[in-house]
Amino acid sequence: MDRARYDRLAILFHWVMAALIFYAAASILIADDLPRGAFRDLIKTSHDSVGAVVVVLLALRILWRLVSRAPAMPSAMTAQQQRLAKLAHLGLYALMAMVPLLGLATLFLRGRGLEFGFFSIASPLAANRALSRSIKEVHELAAYALLALVAFHVAAALWHQFIKRDGLMRRMSFSRSSPAGQTP
């Protein structure tokens, strides 16, 4: 197996979760600017549902990461760069869990269930609007922190691709070519 790359399931988790997180962020920003009504409610409901899916996928992704080793960091990266990359990934994982879990807590504490169109999950929590508002504020701050860390992650990937030209981005691509300087 090519240990310079992530395996296909890890790559699939990465890109599906990236798309869902992008949708969750964009949908709520768009919904906040929409007039009240059925379409706005649909967008907000889909935001909540996507958050729940992210929680499930993250749990599966972590389980997969525990049984499937990640490829080693490229030897061209300094020890400091490797530490920073590991810290950034740890932060991403923490925030990918924290943001949707806080969002679900906000929803449930409002007394609302989770709607998936063809089924729903009732709130397991007693309504507490004041606590819901407080948790929503933390949810929003954590979401902005997640987006900032995602921006850093993307900037680092682009730096590797276009400045260092070390082929690091191929580690997370479905392409069969190996990162520069590494053999399959």
Language-model segments: residues:
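Membrane-embedded alpha-helical bundles that constitute the cytochrome b-like, heme-associated redox core
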Residues: M1-P184
